[in-house]
Amino acid sequence: MKIFEKKYIQGKNVSTFGAFSHDKIVDFNVILPRRCGATSITMHLFGEGIENHKYMKYDFKWVSIQGENDVYACKIDMSKVGVGLYYYKYEITTDEAFFVGEGKRINELTKIEHNDGLIQLTVFKEESNCAKWMHGGIMYHIFVDRFNKSGKCKPKKNVIMNDDWYNGVPQFADVPGGYVENNMFFGGDLYGIIEKLEYIESLGVTCLYLSPIFDAYSNHKYDTGDYMSIDSMFGSEKALDELIKETKKRGMHIIFDGVFNHTGADSIYFNKEGNYDSLGAYQSKKSPYYEWYNFRNYPDDYECWWNVKILPRVDSNNQTYKNYILGDGGVIEKWMKKGIDGFRLDVADELSDDFLKTLNKKLKSVNPDGIVYGEVWEDASNKIAYDKRKKYFLGNELDSVMNYPFREAIIDYIKYGNSERFYSTCKMLSSHYPKHNADLLMNLLGTHDTERILTVLGTDSVDGYTNAELSQKRMSKTEYKKAKELLMLAYAIVATVPGVPCIYYGDEVGMQGYRDPFNRLPFPWGKEDKGILEFYQKIGKIRKQERVFKGGLFKLIECDSNILAFARYDDKEFTVTLVNRSTEKYSFESNISLKSCDTNRKISVLKPMSANILKGNGDIEELELEFYKD
């Protein structure tokens, strides 16, 4: 017995969505076979924030017959439900009563026991229209010290300069997770980025996402020394001014990596090493920064991020700290007024809801079109961190997040053919995330925190290898060839689903690398893999020319272990991304003419290990595709 759920708002089918603005009235429909003899259907809605053991109950009424099915419906006013995260199930009464909840397929309901398989419903404050400039664009994530060296910036004291740009090995711990000084630099800087803006633009990039650039001791700068200054080894504020000016000429934007959960121990605020003129919290309880930190036994026993002693954790609810970061003349206001367009928030899970709301409000007060991203590794719609449910998408906290769940799903599909995981992840993102948040998702294949995507696709587990071994390990020619083919399939997917693709510098030219720090090597200027680069550039042009990538709806058409097909569409036109991850050729037939977005030629064959992005006109619901193995 197949039972389905559909949802409508003012007659418009919104069945794939499960997150709605509180001002909407949603018409819920349950469709089930007449032969089951249903006499009543009731929705049981459980909400966080509602008194314990209480729920809302909605009785559905029979409204029509569709073929051999009965349709029961109930209009539910989201304003009366209230902003929050909810879960629901249906009770269906026939000659017996049973419950149905979320099925494996989109809009499918299945029998459940107790509260297993409840369906998620999110009610948020209001739809956001921020950062429309991000729609249809591409982000480029730069680890500044390793991108391009201008030679204009002098090293600071206590720094090790590695002058071997192409073959130099970064510092690494004797054992994974061990201590690393992280004071070895290769010399990349903001002036170096300016020199390569034409190259970056050729990828279709519209936004630079910079690793932290505030003054700090380390090469990665996650140990902030001074939030109010740009590190001199990156060119100081003068270089940032020049970068902002040059990016604006090209219609590009910049977002900073904001590290507000912890500072460096070597900083104005903590000053453990005494390298700053300030009175740091480590030096005196009379320090203006003392209350920012949690000392268990002053001064050497203090709370740190993941027990890393050089990263003392701050209390994001401390009022003086909030004033410093979020207040008038504070960190957010200064850099937004300088001309950047937003922040990616490091370890957003560890920042309080109040801090996130205040940050978003301050940022938007300076630039209403600015954006706030959060580093969240799981489903951000229902994340629990430190035993507390986060409220990222209920309104005025995060505009979107880094899409790590989708990265894992792509890898699992492209590398192993796991279509079920890919399908379920697409379903989760569509039904759990408000559309305005999903349209801004940072869709990534790699970051400074992951192995290089090419390495992931081309090799198996390296558990048991030492860092010394990994520092020298590279793929064989056979592994590289296979990884290269898979990478292009993966990028075709990540660049055409809802959200914004984010390229980790060097992925587009075939950079390899295992875990940190080997995923942060210098960019191989002059030694790029032209085949991968040209593919990325082609995708960039397609994203720019096709309007459906600026917020078009998403439909998954085919998803098995060999063939993937999905559409982006609006009322008038659509694109279809077709991926053949198998080693065999497939043909396909379509009732609507489909032409390549790249060549404008009609395509009916999918070569082995290939991806095509096609364009069609008309109603996506009328599109029929059939695939045949040749």
Regions found by a protein language model. Name each.
Residues V26-R34, T577-V579:
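Short edge beta-strand/loop segments characteristic of extracellular beta-sandwich folds
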Residues D145, Y386-D387, M442-M475, Y491-D529:
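Aromatic/acidic polysaccharide-binding cleft in carbohydrate-active enzymes
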Residues G137, F143-C207, I213-K337, L359-V366:
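Substrate-binding/active-site clefts of carbohydrate-active enzymes
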Residues M1-D27, I50-H141, F147-W165, Q171-A173:
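The feature marks proteins involved in alpha-glucan
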Residues V30, I142, I200, L210, ...:
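Conserved, mostly hydrophobic/aromatic
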Residues I244-H253, N261-H262, S267-S278, V331, ...:
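Active-site-proximal helices and loops of the catalytic beta/alpha 8
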Residues I557-N591:
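Carbohydrate-binding surface patches
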Residues K602-D630:
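C-terminal beta-strand-rich structural cap/linker in extracellular carbohydrate-active enzymes
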